[in-house]
From Swiss-Prot:
HAMAP family assigned to the protein according to its UniProt record, in alphabetical order: mec17
N-acetyltransferase domain span: 5-185
Site keyed Crucial for catalytic activity: positions: 58
Residues reported in the UniProt entry to bind acetyl-CoA: 119-132, 155-164
Highest taxon, organism lineage: Eukaryota
Function, in words: Specifically acetylates 'Lys-40' in alpha-tubulin on the lumenal side of microtubules. Promotes microtubule destabilization and accelerates microtubule dynamics; this activity may be independent of acetylation activity. Acetylates alpha-tubulin with a slow enzymatic rate, due to a catalytic site that is not optimized for acetyl transfer. Enters the microtubule through each end and diffuses quickly throughout the lumen of microtubules.
The organism of origin for this protein: Trypanosoma cruzi (strain CL Brener)
Enzyme nomenclature, EC number: 2.3.1.108
Gene3D superfamilies assigned: 3.40.630.30
Gene Ontology biological process terms in this record: regulation of microtubule cytoskeleton organization
Bias (Polar residues): 220-229, 313-329
Protein's UniProt name: Alpha-tubulin N-acetyltransferase 1
Any GO CC annotation of this UniProt entry: microtubule
Keywords, sorted A to Z: Acyltransferase, Transferase
Length: 329
């Protein structure tokens, strides 16, 4: 299929050429606050379509990249590569907790690296340097070296890609089908007395950048590779509005039962404390005084009403006390 027919199936995007990163929160913000001319709808359609194409190209049983999955896993993010206003590639990243075999100790260790969960460049744009542009943008934005990234079930083409551009070759086959290159273990040593990797085993990396300060990768220039410089796109995205202040509750109002109002047990305990204090002032030892019989909570509530007894008229018009049931005169 030609490049024109492939692109025709994708909606036009109002994004600059280059790489942008999206997570579930950023997509939700676009849908709510920045959906001019169906921009957010087209963006989500592009991510879903490229996710389906990635599934078909890799002969997978399920779609790995979709807007729904990004909403379910807020830690995952997708790097989207655009060219001439259309999405041409995606790279999905996320942190995973893995138990892998250490290449030197031949024992299982626990790590939680940033993982490549899905990587796809549209077939019409392959072998033109777009894949390296996308991968380099991810490494620069995350602050990682190529060997510090784990890959979920990489294809033969992906492994050849990593060997060609980053010299990643040596890895130990794992039962979970994740590929963790030996370079990942160069910086870390297991802690004594523990059968797993230390708590700080994950490489230092930057957090997900919010969409309002997203760095956009520069426009693709040639097949010689990117220049590894991000440029701030301050005019394309407006910052999200500040969070709304909490609602004001007027004094004396009760928002829900029990808020700003003491329970019967609290009233009973306060009455007990007042009685003990009174006995101390009288000079007696409260521990030697007889303990009064406990009072039920309903009696405390009834006593606290005092003169404000709840009244209810009968059919005959005679008022009675709804607590005692006696007529009122």
């Amino acid at each position: 299929m030609s490049s024109t027919s492939q692109v025709a199936l994708l909606p036009k995007l109002s994004l600059p050429d280059g790489v942008t990163v999206w997570d579930g929160t950023a997509l939700e913000y676009e849908r709510r606050c920045n959906n001019v001319d169906e921009h957010a709808v087209h963006l989500m359609q592009t991510i879903n379509i490229l996710g389906i194409r990635s599934k078909e190209a890799q002969c997978l049983n399920t779609v790995l990249t979709s807007v729904a999955r990004l909403r379910e896993n807020r830690q995952a993010r997708v790097y989207l590569l655009c060219q001439d206003g259309y999405g041409v590639g995606i790279l999905k990243m996320g942190v995973k907790k893995l138990f892998v075999t250490h290449p030197s100790y031949s024992s299982l260790v626990e790590i939680d690296p940033l993982c490549v969960l899905d990587f796809f460049v549209d077939t019409s744009f392959q072998r033109k340097g777009f894949g390296k542009t996308l991968f380099d943008a991810m490494l620069l934005n995350e602050g990682l070296n190529p060997g510090e990234v784990a890959i979920d079930r990489p294809s033969v083409k992906f492994l050849a890609f990593l060997q060609k551009y980053y010299g990643l070759v040596e890895y130990t086959p794992q039962s979970n089908n994740f590929v963790v290159f030996h370079r990942y273990f160069d910086k870390w040593q297991p802690q004594r007395g523990k059968g797993h990797w230390g708590g700080n085993a994950v490489p230092t990396r930057s957090l997900v950048r919010p969409q309002n300060c997203l760095r956009v990768y520069p426009k693709y220039q040639s097949t010689t590779g990117p220049n590894n410089n991000f440029e701030e796109d301050a005019t394309h995205r407006t910052p999200p509005p500040p969070p709304l202040p909490p609602p004001l509750v007027p004094q004396g109002s009760v928002t829900s039962p029990g808020v700003g109002k003491k329970t019967a047990y609290e009233l009973q305990y306060e009455e007990y404390l007042r009685e003990q204090a009174y006995r101390r002032r009288q000079g007696g030892d409260p521990r030697l005084q007889p303990v009064p019989n406990p009072v039920s909570s309903s009696e405390i509530v009834a006593a606290s009403c005092g003169a404000r007894r709840r009244m209810s008229p009968t059919r005959s018009g005679v008022q009675y006390n709804i607590i005692s049931g006696t007529p009122e005169h």
